[in-house]
Structures are given as C-alpha cells and as structure tokens.
C-alpha cells in the first residue's frame, strides 16, 4: 500500500557547507559516529526504546531533496521513529529504502517495528557508509547518511533532540 505522505516528523533541516562555522569537536564526534548510534546511546541509559511514528511505502514524489541521494525506484519504504533513552526523546529518525534494497535478505527491514534500525544494520556484516552530512534545525544538530546493505542504498536522517546525550556529555 502506498501512503499519501502529508508531512514528516522531521522539521526542515539546514545542511551545512564548507562555508559554515566548524562544528564543535564534542558534537562532531557524535555526528561523525561510524558505528551504531543505538549502541552509543546505550552507554548513556538503561533502556532504549523505539516508538514508530510512520511505516509505509511511498513514491518518489514524496522524497523531496532526498531523491537526489537515492536511485529511481517504483516505491520506497519509509520508517519514521522516535528513539527514547530512559523514556526521554533523544532522536527523530527517518529511513528511506528503495524497493530494490529490500529484495533478497533485507525484507526484514519493513518489519522492524520497535527494533532499533542499528541493531539490524550493524548485525548484517554487509554494511558500508557512503557519507555523512551534518545539518541543523535551530539549536539542534542532525546528520544524514547514505548506507549500503550488500551494496544496495538506504538513506538515514537523524535529528538529535534536546535531551540527547550529544548535548549533555563529553565524547564517549
């Protein structure tokens, strides 16, 4: 079923360029994390919980600027979640997956439900990352990564909310 996507849980983000001031080192350490953000968050709480907000198929017309980061596809799986650390909202996550990426062994991605995306991705053994872009939404930091599972792309955008340990801890 294709959803008529009216709005995202993510507010509009401003992606940084080389002309923007440098990102503070402690923040950059979090945003440039190459491993599982879920695992990193687990170092700062006793309980990680995912609250799915939207899980559905969408068309390319719903991608907006994300379309430039993904190949043409008949449809895309969209997953938007709130990641909670000890019952505090820490992160808004938006994952867009071309239908072709779901073929073969990755169809489990559409049934993650309350399972953190990182638990699936980083247990696959076939994960690579093409890039990380850093962005802002007011005082909040964000990042966008194009990842590949067995060479097939998916796009992950994460907005770190005010209660996130990114703002309250030194790099750990």
Curated annotation (Swiss-Prot):
Compartment list: Cytoplasm
Functional pathway: Cofactor biosynthesis; ubiquinone biosynthesis
GO cellular component, one term: cytosol
EC number: 4.1.3.40
Encoding gene (name): ubiC
Root EC class: lyase
Catalytic activity line of the entry: chorismate = 4-hydroxybenzoate + pyruvate
Family named by the database record: Belongs to the UbiC family.
GO terms classed as biological process: pyruvate biosynthetic process; ubiquinone biosynthetic process
A Gene Ontology molecular function term of the record: chorismate lyase activity
Keywords: Cytoplasm, Lyase, Pyruvate, Ubiquinone biosynthesis
Name of the protein in its database record: Probable chorismate pyruvate-lyase
Superkingdom field: Bacteria
Pfam family, one: Chor_lyase
Xref: HAMAP family: UbiC
Protein role: Removes the pyruvyl group from chorismate, with concomitant aromatization of the ring, to provide 4-hydroxybenzoate (4HB) for the ubiquinone pathway.
Residues annotated as binding substrate: 37, 79, 117, 158
